[in-house]
Amino acid sequence: MCGFVGFVGGTDNQSEVLTKMMDRIVHRGPDMGGQFIDGRVALGFRRLSILDLTEAGAQPMANEDGSVVIVFNGEIYNFQELRSELEAKGYKFHCGADTESLLHGYEEWGEAVLDRLRGMYAFVIWDKKKNKLFGARDIFGIKPLYYYPMADAGDGAPGVLFGSEIKSFLDYPHFHKAVNKKALRPYMTLQYSATEETFFEGVYKLPPAHYFTVDIPTGKMNIERYWDCDYSAVEKPFEEYVDELDEVVHESVEAHRIADVKVASFLSGGVDSSYIAACLMPDKTFSVGFDYKNFNETNYAKELSDKLGVENVRKMITADEFFGALDDIQYHMDEPQSNLSSVPLWFLAEMARKDVTVVLSGEGADELFGGYAYYEDTVPVRKYKKMVPLPIRRALGNLALHMPYFKGHNFLVKGAEIPEKSFLGQALVWPEREVDGVLKPEYNTGDGAFELAAPIYARVKGQPELVKKQYLDMNMWLPGDILLKADKMCMAHSLELRVPFLDRKVMEFAEHIPDRYRINENGNKQVLRHAANKSLPDEWATRPKVGFPVPIVYWLREQKWYDYVKEYFTAPWASEFFDTDELMHLLDLHFAGKGDFQRKIYTPLVFLVWYKRFFIDEDQSSVQAA
């Protein structure tokens, strides 16, 4: 695990600029740093040593003649198989790191090396002979990769910035920092940055399962998808699926435990993280809760750890710690992200790093195996579907979509089985119809959430309703929220997080499970729960999703935290983005106990915390430094 930065450009003092960019991400790799500069191409690397702890595994790493150079963040779990195949073809290896297998793999197979990789990765390769860059991101988007095309990179020629974190771009002299005015509208609905162009104007995320090439002389960038899900049900007995999944998960955990350092696991007490912990059997598990009333569920994690004979390390988070960390959290996130679980994850990673360098966690199981409650129909909707033929339900649902919002609107739309018009996934903070009333017109110009979802739904046209929902989450919610915060919060503390459910072999198995084995009258995630039951006590395999419940609904009714939020909502610069009177109205109603508006308050708050850190505090510190 590590972080990398780089650019193609003609700026003065290339090494000095590259060092400053690398210093921005030293948390991703505190063990070692390295540079490579060749003309206009500059690569920088910060290393967190996990495989081959010697300097032989350092990056940037070049092949024998120096014609191909790589910077790589992540882990390739099948690197030993690739190495054996490449050695048979005559390639020489000089270290035990997986980076070298990826490097020589590119030499042998070119861009097709991506079809052979099993792992989490983001990398950029400088191919001197072809005078091009080749960069890619893993199929799920576990590891981040950003880029910033420049028409003039400082020498009159086109160029590009690229790296693991956007903040590294701030130190490039020809980077223009500005808020992307189109990003705020979908964020208000979804709570995360859902557009390929980030909250920094002109900075883009490379989507999961995509690669790019950059022709150095012309600056032309080409982006292609190299992998996609293949949802096609394969009929076989339920018990056979259960047995096979248990084998697949155990094998994935075994592959994900490879390291030359200690490996532990996060544990919430829910079935996903519990299953991983039971397969891994680490020396330690780590859990967090909140020091407030009934918001501490770490007792479940402690109980399971005791049953497994594993030490459980726990921490209780206070309100002061929660709000005190928001500024640093949004800095490390790079973009606003108002998933409340980012904060407990921050403290969880901080705690775990005191003991270990690598942790395994249960992210991805809900998306692959149908674990979210919103994948299921409510009892009234199920009855409606049984009683009323689909053509009639479709007609009523489409009629409702063309009418002003009314009570029963969502019921009719959900019953119509048209998720393209009704389903956006986990986080629905501000309904799209309400965003217009709180955003200033200048920042209400971007695509809405359903417009962003449309091309994703188009790729699974004709698939069952459940598949469409899972596919949308796989392409929006999972990389945009779950995996991004997992990477950023853990790497902020120099901790590598691995996710065995999000494995190529696990996905190739999961995509063929019939829908009725995922969700049925017995509940959700059925195949996974029965597989987990082989390794867990009965009560754990059937436990509901736990996550990180946060008591912010109560904290916002305390004077101290009301005043904290009010200071942001009434700041002079806040009115550039929001109707701050409307925000204060919601805050006052919530404070008085006249409604629960915690998420509608927290989402704009997080944006303002992010904006202040990057566009006010950052600029002030730059002036002082000058």
Feature names for model-found ranges:
Residues 71-72, 183, 244, 339-343, ...:
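A conserved catalytic-core signature of glycosyltransferases
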